């Protein structure tokens, strides 16, 4: 609690702290109850603390995946953890299904790094309240986003070999 309290007293804001054996479980623990709390989520606590939670609470599981899982009768993280891995992969794809099935079981082998790795790419995204339906609407936004990315790349003295533009809908 010492670090959490020091941040609150010296900087004036609250933080949640999650403690566990891997990054996934520590992050899940930090989201249990807010604000200004310390929680644990050790492997032996997974069945009582994590598995009763709805699948939407699993780290990195988005709305589209949640919908597919709930339509298949998988409503909790525990349901997902107890499903066959191939069933989750069929619903979510091989790579995402494997990763999320492991997460539901509390497995995360990603290393803790003292220094962040250098970014492999530069990106920017914008969410709109209303659908974009014409080129005239999207062009100024696209130009602004290109300028933002180009500025970051110049600052880091980077060049690129490809550019990708993605448009997504909530559907």
Place the predicted regions along the sequence by residue:
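DNA-contacting surface of Y-family translesion DNA polymerases
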Residues: 65, 70-171
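Gly/Gly-Pro- and Ser/Thr-rich, intrinsically disordered tail segments characteristic of DNA damage-repair
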Residues: 1-99, 151
